[in-house]
Amino acid sequence: MSLAIAGTGWITPLGSGVDAVWHKLLDGHEAAATKISEQFRTRFYSVFRVPESALTTPASHPRLRRASLISRFAAAAGLEALRSAGITPDSQSAERIALVFAISNGGVIYTKRFYRDIVATGAQSASPLLFPETVFNAPASHVAAILGITGATYTLVGDGAVGILAIKMADDLMTNEELDYCLVVGAEEADWLLCDAYRRWRLLRLAPPIEPFAQLGRGMILSEGAGAVLLARVGRRRRADAKDDPVLIERTHPGGYYRKRAEAEEILKRILCDLSQTEIDFVISSANGTFIDLAECRALKQVTPNALVYTAKPALGESVGAAGLWQVVLAAQALRCGELPPLLRAEPTIPLRISASRIPVTTARHAIVLSCGVNQQAAGLRLRKAD
């Protein structure tokens, strides 16, 4: 089934709003890193945080007064996606909107606080206010309540590829004729504990920049934020966005799992082969400065050597749970606007079609979103700009 992207939402370290963030990427902006530390710890890590100004709209909602950052990011992105599609759920339409939430690390900040109190002073100190925020489906619950969505709600847990897998799930859900739309949201919050874990797995670098497709992967920088995509059946797009050429999700690929890093390249090749049955104009990659870059570079060079390649992670960081949705928003914007941003921090010797300056793609019709997570998942999808 081909689904139309009816609306998108973006909360990133470069701010909020799809158009605003898009223009910053086109201008070559790069998020500013913030140093974070932990009590009684001497090690500092760099992260790309979302500016407070990006969360002004939904933060006043009563349900979000004590909610975790990840829930606030998700609500803001979901609200923007609905607004961009001209949709305000009411008692009747809310039942015909499904929600699929993509998550990876979850609400780490509140979970850490909850268990720290227990360890410090005993089980009697466990906060009933914090506990609901420790479960993976807490952000989905907040988003559904705030946006007024009463249809089916699901939470999908995975790694950096989980956003693409969530869209695959939405594609399956939309075969139900009782649904008109499906809102797919992915979100992530950055914390010292996550940075320390990824460093121990030799996936993190202590300070920017992220160097994509480097021969020696020096690691990623974690970031936070959310992305949202509102999917509709072709023909159900509102007049509010009728002036734009619709972007369709032409095919979703379930991807696969790799046990060893050396196997990632073969899975990525298989995904690209299945999705490139038509001419592909550009690929939005998930290269983030880790082993993923080399695997994707080899797969892209072999299967789609003529396609332009771009990754936003040098500018935005690795947002894990939100990363896949960010890639889809990027691909849709590039097809609509006919332009790709400059690839930052890339060496000119990379054996792919890349550009260090913004490049027009006005005739582009097909794009692939390729997503490989660091925890053994890979997936992809193909977008098409409708005639």
Q: Which positions does each model-derived feature cover?
A:
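Conserved "HGTGT" condensation-loop signature of ketosynthase/thiolase-family condensing enzymes
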Residues: 1-152, 164, 172-176, 187, ...
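Short beta-strand-to-loop elements that line the ligand-binding cleft
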Residues: 154-156
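Catalytic nucleophile serine of serine hydrolases
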Residues: 160-162
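Internal active-site segments that recognize and position negatively charged phosphoryl groups
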Residues: 169
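Alpha-to-beta junction loops
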Residues: 178-180
